[in-house]
Amino acid sequence: KKMQAAGNDILNLGIGSPDIAAPKLVIDTLKETASHKEASQYQPYNGIAALRIGFSDWYRRVFDVTLDYETEILPLLGSKEAVMHIHLAFCNPGDTILVPNPGYPAYAASAKLLGLTIVYYDLEESNNWMASIDQLQQKVTRNCKILWVNYPNMPTGAVVGKKELSDLVNFAKHNNLLLVNDNPYSMVLN
């Protein structure tokens, strides 16, 4: 922000915020649907079953993962809500989370609201933008609860391989961490 204020042209790679309007068909459908009396009623907290079944089917087809739509899928309003829910479920004030730099600002923003300690680990070009297990080992603490990763990564575009992902899983298991791969760009960058 200081560099922008000084007149430097800065490209913000922090959040993928769309700057185009939704397609006309989507807008027209939303307008039409909003006129239904059911549209203003409260929806089930866990979403409608048809949506959760659809998500479960998609995960099976795309990732070869079986999810129970009744107990393992919770549709949310967006990633910020999901990040907050994960922090609320797995952390207490004073706990530590490991966050990539560069990375999604919502990880730290949510953590700050909840009184968590944020420890950043660097994603470096010399390591193909992958999390370094050696660096993570130096940063992990006794009260560390979550390791956030983001692959395919934004803003770097790095795609994690099976070996690197296996290394991250083993590191998380060894250190009793919840490993969260925030994966919003899986269908765009893979």
Model-found features: residue ranges?
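Structural loop-to-beta junction motif characteristic of Rossmann-like glycosyltransferase folds
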Residues: 95, 115-119
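Active-site phosphate-binding strand-loop segment of PLP-dependent enzymes
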Residues: 119, 123-190
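N-terminal small-domain helix-loop-helix segment of the aminotransferase-like
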Residues: 1-78, 85
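Short acidic capping loops at alpha-helix termini that bridge into adjacent secondary structure
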Residues: 67-73, 93-96, 143
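Conserved PLP-anchoring active-site segment centered on the Schiff-base-forming lysine
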Residues: 89-111
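Short glycine-rich anion-binding loops that position phosphate/pyrophosphate groups of nucleotides
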Residues: 18, 80, 104, 151-155
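Helix C-cap/helix->beta junction micro-motif
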Residues: 6, 114, 174-175
